[in-house]
A protein has these predicted regions:
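Extracellular/periplasmic, surface-exposed regions of secreted and cell-surface proteins
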Residues: 1-183, 235-238
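Surface-exposed, extracytoplasmic segments of Gram-negative outer-membrane nutrient-acquisition systems
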Residues: 54-62, 100-125, 157-224, 232, ...
Length: 306
């Protein structure tokens, strides 16, 4: 304690810092060369149904392991400050942290000529920056009544700095477009899929039927929110206590296949007026504004598949 800093306003103040370094070996769920085949058909891509006469079959596992695989390494830095004012009526806290992940373990896709689908290897370098700010306010604090408010703000940015040599993105989930991927130079994770073809001004281009043209596959959205807010309050009167919590996430996208199929089959609310006309907001090949009407349920079904 420093006597020179004692006063009636600042009750407590602290500056903190920490450093940690952790290694992680990764998950080895399939550490065998071959796996038994049960059933058949579409899932096994074979017309045969196993077991046959009580005999099962084995197929090579689609994942191979890098013989030079090493643990991924995470270095964490954290800096922060805490301050309490007016006998802890107001408490403020701020924390900045950064995580650097090196040798991130991923399943990196391989060419079919290798006889495997992917290889578990050290395939990336990532970093995370986090800012967190909290405020606690306790305006009423008596023996029989206590009322407290809390507020917090969090902003987190995950970035993929690099992946394995020759690999631009790694699929984390999804069978067809769109997929969730880790892409070099992008936030982690991102939604990767078909994009619209655009002109030099960023306008979506349409074909001679008024339907949007498909562009190259790429990043079409990010999963993580821009920031998160939280609010909580609790009121205690004698032995009774009432609490409330409010959470808010701003930003971030998601893809709903259910909604897409509802649009395609005409069962969603926004396709209720499918007997009318649609003019897609875009430009034609000559650069003029699109004025081609899409009419009828069949044409609109084609529109929703784009």
């Amino acid at each position: 304690e420093l006597e020179a800093l004692k006063n009636d306003i600042v009750t407590f103040a602290k500056i903190r810092a920490s450093y940690a370094e952790v290694g992680q070996a990764g998950d080895y769920m399939d550490n065998f060369f071959s796996i038994p085949v049960y059933g058949g058909g579409f899932y096994q891509l074979t017309p045969l149904m196993y077991p046959i006469n009580g005999n099962t079959a084995y197929t090579p596992h689609y994942v191979i392991y890098d013989p030079n695989l090493k643990p991924q390494n995470t270095k964490s830095y954290e800096f922060g400050a805490d301050i309490s004012l007016w006998d802890n009526i107001i408490n403020l806290s701020y924390t900045y942290s950064r995580q650097n992940v090196k040798d991130q373990i991923f399943e990196v896709p391989l060419s079919g000529s290798t006889g495997a689908q992917s290889m578990l290897t050290n395939g990336g370098k990532l970093h995370t920056n986090t800012h967190e700010f909290t405020v606690d306010f306790n305006p009423i604090r008596t023996k029989n009544v206590d009322w407290n408010f809390g507020f917090n703000f969090t902003k987190m940015l995950n970035m993929v700095d690099e992946l394995a040599p020759g690999v631009e993105s790694i699929t984390l989930g999804g069978y067809v477009t769109p997929q969730v991927r880790a892409s070099a130079g992008e936030e982690f994770p991102v939604i990767y899929g078909s994009t619209y073809k655009r002109d030099e001004n960023g306008n979506i281009m349409v074909d001679e039927n008024g339907l949007p043209l498909k562009g190259e596959d790429g990043v079409i959205g990010k999963v993580s929110p821009d920031f998160m807010l939280g609010f909580n309050t609790s009121l205690r009167v004698w032995k009774f206590k009432l609490s409330a919590v409010f959470d808010w996430k701003q930003g971030g996208q998601m893809y709903s296949r259910t909604t897409g199929l509802g649009d395609y089959y005409g069962t969603s609310i926004r396709t209720a007026d499918r007997e009318g006309t649609i003019i897609f907001d875009g430009v034609k090949a000559d650069g003029s504004k699109n004025d081609i009407e899409i009419t009828g349920p069949i044409a609109q079904q084609t529109y929703y598949t784009r």
